[in-house]
Amino acid sequence: MKLHELRPAEGSRKSPKRVGRGTGSGLGKTSARGENGQNSRSGGGVRPGFEGGQMPLYRRLPKRGFTNIFAKKYTAINIDRLNIFEDDTVVTPELLIEKGVISKVYDGVKILGNGELDKKLIVKATKFSKAAAEKIEAAGGKVEVI
């Protein structure tokens, strides 16, 4: 076999539908749109969710709940992510952003207790879970709420 003898696998290369190019092509005249009706027209068709005039499902179901505009949004981070720092480092939200551990601080940073911490760190954050605070102190570190 030579390079010029290579051929694509059978059925892997399909030519596109060229509609409206004469009746002999099989896709002439109505261009595979059927006869008359909304879908045969330019720009025809119904919007998503339209059920032919029947009250659509999204309007039959009741509205529920509301958005609390006073809700605080904390950036959550597990303590196993803090193992990248050296012993006795003061870990602040600014340092976490600088090191790429988190990308953005909204209303503060909350430290969660998933994983293990091997380093002795001074961690400054807005909130701590009970498990996270215990694990930081067990590793010889300090917890400071800012």
Swiss-Prot record:
Alphabetically ordered keywords of this record: Ribonucleoprotein, Ribosomal protein, RNA-binding, rRNA-binding
Q: Where is the composition biased (Basic and acidic residues)?
A: 1-13
Entry-linked PROSITE patterns:
RIBOSOMAL_L15 (PS00475)
Biased-composition ranges, Gly residues, are 42-52
Q: Entry's Pfam families?
A: Ribosomal_L27A
Keyword Ligase among UniProt keywords:
no
Q: Name one GO biological process term.
A: translation
- UniProt keyword RNA-binding, yes or no: yes
TM spans, by residue?
A: none
Q: Which GO terms describe its molecular function?
A: rRNA binding; structural constituent of ribosome
Q: Where is this region: Disordered?
A: 1-55
Which GO terms of the cellular component aspect does the record hold? Answer: cytosolic large ribosomal subunit
InterPro entries, per this entry? Ribosomal_uL15 (IPR030878), Ribosomal_uL15/eL18 (IPR021131), Ribosomal_uL15/eL18_sf (IPR036227), Ribosomal_uL15_bac-type (IPR005749), Ribosomal_uL15_CS (IPR001196)
- What function is annotated for this protein? Binds to the 23S rRNA.
Q: How does it assemble?
A: Part of the 50S ribosomal subunit.
Q: Which family does it belong to?
A: Belongs to the universal ribosomal protein uL15 family.
Protein name from the UniProt record? Large ribosomal subunit protein uL15
Gene name, please?
rplO
